Amino acid sequence: MSVIKMIDLDLAGKRVFIRADLNVPVKDGKVTSDARILASLPTIKHCLEAGAKVMVTSHLGRPTEGEYAEEFSLLPVVNYLNDALDCEVRLVKDYLDGVELNAGELVVLENVRFNKGEKKNEEALSKKYAALCDVFVMDAFGTAHRAQASTHGVGMFAPIACAGPLLADELEALGKAMDKPARPMVAIVGGSKVSTKLTVLESLSKIADQLVVGGGIANTFIAAAGHNVGKSLYEADLVETAKKLMEECAIPVATDVACAKAFDENAEAEIKHVSEVQDDDMIFDLGPNSTAELAEILKNAKTILWNGPVGVFEFKNFEAGTRGIAEAIAQSEGFSVAGGGDTLAAIDKFGIKADVSYISTGGGAFLEFVEGKKLPAVEMLEARAKA
């Protein structure tokens, strides 16, 4: 993937417009989770230290487009940056007709979704953003799958459009896992339904040497292998699709499972061979033998792509499968990439953050990349790099 990288540019004295992902949770005017801001700080600091005139913006929440609403203001982010950078950071509300700032100064441009035409990627708004800067930096991978004025349109008209460090790292890591993976390559896809991950499964079945399925998705494959899944969540209409995928790719099906009679946090886990599941059973996790078999596969993998837990890991009695998978990934010497909200929650719960090679910051964008779709913001950066 050929894009211009921000770190390769001379930014001294340049007006730099950074589209970051600062869409953080806010309560009572305070940022309650700063992970996304922390991820963006190195990009901002690099520009400031280079002597650039720095403008950073983002969306926050889902305001009615074109209307200001205080609850969706970036002011809490500005207050956070003031403390984190120990310098004065201004919030600029009206900026479409120009922004005055000095070299080495940082301003935050108010929520892009307050601007009419943002979501529809309107050309007039895109050109106004572009007129603010000498260099446009796209650094929000989480919104790279959306063609909007601040993620795509602005880059078409800015003098220079480049990838920020976060976006560049993300593309490099995902490219390493997907385009030319070291083998064997193992992909793990968990989640409740095959239907929501079908394109992901089809895409990965063509790349992976082994495709591990978990959660409700695994139940459909267990049914496809001819076993009873009782009252478990599964999709009968996709059993034939699962069979077809099993013919195309090595998909290990669980040999034992953890069941209960009801979806209850306190339900006791009953370990059963997959052939012994009763009509009133519900499968909530992999059994110990299946977990051990998959752990062995993962330990020998050279590339691992992980999206989704393999069981109801939020319940203590049904966390063992996901824990076993997480620990095997942590122990693997292969290159590992993980992404998706539930996956990140599992990584946090089992304390393996430092042992995963790369953790993706994008939910929808991560999935679309894995599906093999072109991300509009990335396509734009590639086109500008060629121009």
From Swiss-Prot:
Pathway the protein acts in: Carbohydrate degradation; glycolysis; pyruvate from D-glyceraldehyde 3-phosphate: step 2/5
Top EC class for this record: transferase
Subcellular locations according to the entry: Cytoplasm
InterPro entries named among the record's database cross-references: Phosphoglycerate_kinase, Phosphoglycerate_kinase_CS, Phosphoglycerate_kinase_N, Phosphoglycerate_kinase_sf
Residues that, per the record, bind substrate: 21-23, 36, 59-62, 113, 146
SUPFAM superfamilies tied to this protein: Phosphoglycerate kinase
GO biological process, one term: glycolytic process
Record's keyword annotation contains Cytoplasm: yes
GO cellular component terms, semicolon-separated: cytosol
A Gene Ontology molecular function term of the record: ATP binding
Pfam families: PGK (PF00162)
Gene3D superfamilies given in the database record: Phosphoglycerate kinase, N-terminal domain
Keywords: ATP-binding, Cytoplasm, Glycolysis, Kinase, Nucleotide-binding, Transferase
Catalytic activity line of the entry: (2R)-3-phosphoglycerate + ATP = (2R)-3-phospho-glyceroyl phosphate + ADP
Binding site for ATP: 197, 314, 340-343
UniProt-listed Enzyme Commission number(s): 2.7.2.3
Quaternary context: Monomer.
PANTHER family registered for this protein in UniProt: PHOSPHOGLYCERATE KINASE (PTHR11406), PHOSPHOGLYCERATE KINASE 1, CHLOROPLASTIC-RELATED (PTHR11406:SF23)
Recorded family membership: Belongs to the phosphoglycerate kinase family.
HAMAP family in UniProt: Phosphoglyc_kinase
Name the UniProt record assigns to this protein: Phosphoglycerate kinase
Species this chain originates from: Vibrio cholerae serotype O1 (strain ATCC 39315 / El Tor Inaba N16961)
Lineage, opening ranks: Bacteria, Pseudomonadati, Pseudomonadota, Gammaproteobacteria, Vibrionales
